[in-house]
Amino acid sequence: MERIFNEQLEYCGVDYFDYYLLHNMGTNVYDKCQKYDAFGFAAKKKAEGKIKYLGMSFHDMPELLDEILGKYGDIFDFIQLQINYVDWEQPNVQSHRCLEVANKYKKPVFVMEPCKGGTLVNLPDEALKLMKDYDPDASAASWAFRFAASQEGVVVCPAGTRSNG
């Protein structure tokens, strides 16, 4: 891990990272992070000042997020979650419940996929008509961003569309 971390610093031309993510945290990645003590390594880099703010992008069920934050929450400064109105109650994503877990541990949330890769920008005509009837000046993207950004605990909601329609 040390070699890869140093290569990342060198590649970016920096002495430290302002924000650093443990990426794609789910069951398989979590198991590997525990096996190779990636959490301890990241905590060490924070203590050395090589990482200012440590986060993780999470891609699994809320129960696993609760387990991770229960064990390692003290090292994480933020959590990146997939939050949009389609995935809010989806059984295989459970954005709403994951956000509740992040809030339980008082972790600021950075949103990923607020427009679901552009899907929520290019809506079917029937859905777009409902939105336009309610607010003619609001775009489909603005509805998606307002939904994600208005959730409790959300502090960053970047654009992430693959298509701007």
Residue ranges with predicted function:
Residues 22-165:
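Beta/alpha (TIM)-barrel catalytic core signal, keyed to glycine-rich beta->alpha loops juxtaposed to Asp/Glu
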Residues 7-30:
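Active-site groove signature of glycoside hydrolases
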